[in-house]
Amino acid sequence: MRFIILGIFAATVLFSCAQAEEAWPRFRGDNSSGIATGKAPPIEFGPGKSELWRVPLASGHSSPCVVGDSIFLTTYESEQKKLAVVCVDRHRGEIRWQRVVPATQIERGHPSFNPASSTPACDGERVVAYFGSFGLICFDLSGRKLWEKKMPLAKSFAGNATSPAIIGDRVILYRGNYVDHYLLAVDKKTGKELWKVPQKETFTGEMACTSCPIVVGNRLIVHTARSVQAFDIATGERLWVVKCATTATSTPILAGDEVIVAAWNKMGEPALRPPFPTFEKLIEEHDKNGDSRIGHDEFPVLWIFHRPDGIEAPMNGGTVSFGHADRNKDGGISAEEWPRTIEELERFRAGYDSHGMLAIPVDSEGMVAADKVRTLETMSIPEVPSPLYDGKYLYFVKNGGILTCLELETGERVYRTRTGGRGTHYASPLIAGGNIYSSAGDGLISVLQLGEDPEILAKNDMKDGVYATPAIVDGTIYVRTHSALHAFREP
């Protein structure tokens, strides 16, 4: 694996800024690892506490991209239907410049989606942003447009939240929707296409396009719909493929000589598939008129799949329809109809394989056999947040603030606990100063210590929703809420 380790350092030199510890150049920082180096940020913070500044922003779920004295984000003003790339002065908390991105139509998606969900990438000379409503656009650090690469309006159920990565002399983008589905490399100076690899998997409504490519030596690793793939960064040649039951919502991380991926799907574990009641139970609890049938007004909400720890989120599951269960359309569900309905629904569920936290050898080749991939865990897999690795332990947080810690070498579970956060989690956790920073969608940011003892050190209420993953640079944590960007630092 020597070539891989050397390649990591080479790639870091190529695409990172000279001020490595002073930068957070893409989604989740250096190579999307989620690990901040240097001075630790505050443990306790919030509006009015350890707060350097706060700047109001238009809506958006993109994370802060921090390079030098600049912070780059994307925004969306819904009333004007206006997309923009924004540069904020890192020290003063003032908007330095804002450039409108001239989209003719605005991408639609899940109710939790925002058209400005993609995090910009910066190499110290240029900043590149992606919008499913427009395509790629590049500016220099003063806000002068350098190039653009327009793309058709992305159309999907979830919406495009994928983020570009600048690696060496190129920009890498994974784009997936009903219109097109591919991995793309363009010249970072001109926007000229270098290669494009169409994806063989047809993009469906159950798939997501939110992951960011990472680099290991000469290999790009991409979490794509129903697979994890590696590509040669120079040519786009597909080097290996791992087929898995995943919607591809999270970003992979590197852990030694393995790639760690949270492969999740909506029916991938028992907690997401509530049991169906027997007909006798239905009658006992819901037959209000005593006719030994279940009428339309008596039929309860029954989940085919369900996110029990994200119940407040819109469209958080799928339910059994009365019309499907009332097979003869006589207005009532009988003792003969219900078992047949359950049988069909269970067959439908059986079409979804179990998901899991996967460990894939970086130097795999071709179509990777299942026995070459380690499944570290199959329960409490996060849908959106990406995992973390501290050199020994693997951490991941799912909806409900459920934090799991595994020892990577053995795959043994060290603990499973709650962070204090509740509800849906969209932002990915981060490591800084020997602690984990975990953000809940309702704006509670919990800080827990690393290692075998998961003590909760603080619960910081931002008083606003947090869907964007924070950025941590030189002892400052930058938190984007639904309405503003905050900077927190110890006095």
At which residue positions do the language-model features occur?
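Noncatalytic, solvent-exposed loop/strand surfaces
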Residues: 17-491
